């Protein structure tokens, strides 16, 4: 048990696989891809933040490709998973049990998320 605790301290919370690192390195060589991805993330993050604000959901400001948001209904992660939308619960990282990490997707993915969240009210 002690060894498992020690190993757990060394592992980063959102680890990245070797193939993902190789793909990311190759993507960085394509400046057009990087610029398009940056633009998409900026636009789509604003769309999600505006939606969360209108719905009264608390979220943490983000400078990355994800948002931490408190979703005000029980079992939000499971309900979204049932609709083929995966989000990560952040309770094990010290946040409230209703706080989730939502990655910024493309316009269609984010619209699907918004539509499903609207249906939960």
Language model regions located:
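Short beta-strand/turn micro-motifs at beta-sheet edges
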Residues: 13, 87-91
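PLP-dependent aminotransferase class I/II
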Residues: 1-52, 57-58
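Conserved PLP-binding catalytic core of the aspartate aminotransferase-like
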Residues: 42, 46, 50-83
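PLP-dependent enzyme catalytic core of the Aspartate aminotransferase-like
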Residues: 82-83, 92-121
